[in-house]
């Protein structure tokens, strides 16, 4: 077993990614052929569940793009299910301290190294027990990325970086800016200073820094500072803004006057 994404991070090769929020396998496969190094299947803010994550993993599998899956929470039961359907790289949201980081790592490892439940006969990840010595190989193939998204997490960054089994730390600019008092403005100078300092600190500790940033200039700036996995766009945004721009070129205007609510 191997994890190409994990190996690329360990080798210091920057990985450029795209966020997937459309929650379906058809668009996931379409984007898997676009040339991105990694694709984030979002279970926190997109309408995904274990079944939809599975179908997207299957759709992406024939392509070079590597899947990264974000569960909705640092929950060992949910993590176990995602690993069993074939996720190897997880992005764990809202990790605040070293204990929570250790819990995330433990959830991805079989005993005695962790607490992952054994159900390989039912698991796509083990090819239904067709992979010899799966239990020993699986632990080494796991890639654990944790998100720091608050001032508390930033203050605990050094201890989070000391946790064995953490491969990378992802800075969440939207939640971080909100927690710092600048909701909706991740480009505020104070937020940017915090992000840049964190990238340098993470890389200096021998871990991979990551972030989502659709602003091209800032994304390149983060790469220059040492970020190793950078998502540079979101599928829903690409579709929405692209469709609006096309309509506008033909004189159409966005009209939401008939909308009575989000439902």
Swiss-Prot record:
Cofactor remark: Binds 1 divalent metal cation per subunit.
GO cellular component: cytoplasm
Record site feature (Increases basicity of active site His), residues: 84
Active site: 45
Cofactor: a divalent metal cation
GO MF term set: 4-hydroxy-2-ketopimelate aldolase activity; metal ion binding
Keywords: Aromatic hydrocarbons catabolism, Lyase, Metal-binding
Entry-linked SUPFAM superfamilies: Phosphoenolpyruvate/pyruvate domain
Record site: Transition state stabilizer: 70
One biological process term in Gene Ontology: phenylacetate catabolic process
Functional description taken from the UniProt entry: Catalyzes the reversible retro-aldol cleavage of 4-hydroxy-2-ketoheptane-1,7-dioate (HKHD) to pyruvate and succinic semialdehyde.
Protein family according to the UniProt entry: Belongs to the HpcH/HpaI aldolase family.
NCBIfam families recorded: HpaI
PANTHER family: 2-KETO-3-DEOXY-L-RHAMNONATE ALDOLASE, PHOSPHOENOLPYRUVATE CARBOXYLASE FAMILY PROTEIN
Complex and partners: Homohexamer; trimer of dimers.
Protein's UniProt name: 4-hydroxy-2-oxo-heptane-1,7-dioate aldolase
Source organism per UniProt: Salmonella dublin
